[in-house]
């Protein structure tokens, strides 16, 4: 294995970070929590199975009446609020008190007054599936909503699933299982039951699993929900669990970008190596099918830590013009293709290698926004997509990186941060720093003052709560992944400052 540079001590923060992995630290999801709040106790149909979920919902409602993100990201607010409204409408009569009534009234007001822009902003995974299902549920409860505003979304759903034979939903591990709730009353319960993961979930989705439990009883699925609630302790559910492959791979990737390859990572690396198959690897060893993004980043991490790799696990995801993250997806992912390109540049030679690299480079070139930055389907901020595109293109297409460096420099805020949604965040600042530190030496040398402001900002804000910016069925924040990006940026900045001082 590659040694850790002797002149770079391993910070205590990194040791603590590695020790905390595989615990599933992730932000709460009002969308999934609301599905669980609808479940009734097995021995009392007038009592909630998990009353703590209602408490969480009432505590987490935003000041504008919405649920979900507090950022101006309309789709997350919409599906989270509709999910909460259905849960509030389904409460037993004994719980229809003043607090629940006020929450429902303000949420209804939000949907009427503040969702005119619902088609703008980042998309969510499965949005065109789950929104029509939520609207159907709201209509069945006669909730007074502006249904005409959302005309057309059902056609999008039908366009996505119309060509898929229904039997495939239950016979293969497609991404549709992760959004099983889109089936509404059309679910085949026994066919679905056969697709339960060994961990008791449907594709590691609490909301899909709770949806199933609303229609039938299943001890294994119920224990999956109960275990998550016990482990979290605040009455909330996340949008995905478990996700340990994703967490380990992204954390080790961020550390490696800062030159950190600690010996303490070896058990985690062995876990990744054992999980990787000829068909790739997914977010977790169980529950979700392999995908190109987790496969590519796992390969990249293993290579960076000295493990032999090949391009074989990426072959199932190759398309005509780019690499697919999942089957059936509508749009390609910039970051997934960037991660694939990183791997293609370091694996042993194989037939068509150069042609495939050029295909991915062309896709990334064509995917630029305004010729100087990128956006991605798996993260709400363009600073993530741009950073990861730059990481891949620096060696193979540096001409595409120069405009991105200029865009990044010009996007910094006065307080030293970067942020896309109204204010800066430590996470987005970390990505901007990581990307800028791959620039030519003369570019970095000319940024002494901006980088010093970025370092000061990160030092002041590193303990702030993680703001969910990652995109699943709702926005989420993988705590340790974000922490690792910030640590990586801080190490890079400290090393750069040390180098300047030595000069």
What are these regions (language model features)?
Residues 7-12, 183-186, 220, 309-311, ...:
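Helix-turn-helix repeat elements of alpha-solenoid scaffolds
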Residues 13-20, 183-196, 233:
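Repeat-mediated protein-protein interaction surfaces in helical alpha-solenoids
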Residues 17-18, 57, 107, 111, ...:
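Buried hydrophobic core positions in alpha-solenoid tandem helical repeats
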Residues 105-110, 270, 293-294, 316-322:
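Short, conserved phosphate-binding/catalytic loop or strand-edge motifs used
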């Amino acid at each position: 294995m590659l040694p850790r540079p002797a002149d770079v001590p391993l910070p205590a923060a990194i040791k603590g970070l590695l020790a905390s992995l595989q615990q599933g630290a992730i932000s709460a999801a009002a969308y999934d929590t609301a599905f669980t709040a609808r479940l009734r106790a097995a021995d009392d149909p007038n009592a909630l199975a998990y009353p703590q979920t209602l408490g969480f919902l009432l505590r987490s409602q935003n000041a504008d009446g919405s649920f979900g993100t507090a950022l101006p990201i309309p789709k997350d607010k919409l599906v989270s609020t509709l999910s909460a409204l259905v849960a509030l409408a389904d409460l037993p009569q004994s719980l229809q008190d003043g607090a629940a009534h006020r929450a429902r009234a303000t949420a209804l007001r939000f949907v009427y007054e503040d969702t005119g822009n619902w088609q703008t902003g980042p998309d969510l995974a499965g949005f065109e599936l789950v929104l029509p299902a939520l609207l159907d549920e709201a209509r069945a409860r006669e909730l007074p909503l502006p249904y005409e505003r959302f005309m057309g979304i059902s056609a999008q759903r039908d366009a996505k699933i119309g060509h898929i034979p229904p039997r495939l939903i239950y016979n293969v591990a497609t991404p549709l299982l992760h959004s099983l709730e889109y089936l509404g009353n059309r679910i085949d319960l026994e066919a679905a039951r056969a697709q339960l993961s060994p961990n008791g979930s449907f594709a590691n989705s609490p909301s899909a699993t709770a949806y199933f439990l609303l229609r039938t009883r299943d001890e294994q699925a119920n224990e999956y929900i109960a275990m998550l609630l016990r482990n979290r302790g605040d009455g909330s559910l996340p949008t995905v669990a478990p996700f340990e492959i994703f967490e380990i791979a992204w954390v080790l990737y961020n550390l490696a970008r800062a030159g950190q390859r600690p010996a303490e990572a070896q058990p985690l690396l062995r876990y990744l190596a054992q999980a990787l198959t000829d068909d790739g690897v997914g977010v977790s060893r169980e529950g979700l099918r392999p995908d190109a993004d987790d496969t590519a980043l796992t390969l990249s991490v293993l290579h960076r830590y000295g493990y032999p790799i090949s391009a074989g696990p990426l072959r199932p995801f190759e398309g005509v013009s780019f690499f697919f993250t999942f089957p059936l997806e509508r749009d390609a992912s910039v970051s997934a293709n960037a991660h694939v390109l990183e791997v293609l540049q370091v694996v042993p030679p194989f037939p068509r290698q150069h042609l495939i690299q050029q295909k991915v480079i062309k896709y990334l070139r064509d995917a630029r926004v305004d010729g100087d930055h990128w956006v991605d389907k798996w993260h709400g901020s363009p600073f993530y997509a741009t950073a990861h595109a730059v990481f891949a293109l620096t060696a193979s297409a540096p001409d595409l990186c120069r405009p991105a460096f200029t865009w990044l420099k010009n996007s910094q805020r006065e307080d030293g941060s970067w942020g896309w949604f109204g204010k800066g965040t430590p996470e987005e600042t970390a990505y901007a720093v990581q990307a800028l530190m791959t620039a030519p030496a003369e570019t970095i040398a000319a940024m002494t003052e901006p980088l010093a402001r970025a370092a000061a900002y990160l030092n002041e804000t590193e303990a702030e709560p993680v703001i969910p910016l990652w995109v699943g069925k709702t926005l989420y924040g993988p705590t340790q992944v974000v922490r690792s990006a910030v640590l990586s940026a801080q190490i890079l900045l400290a090393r750069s400052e040390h180098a300047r001082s030595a000069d």
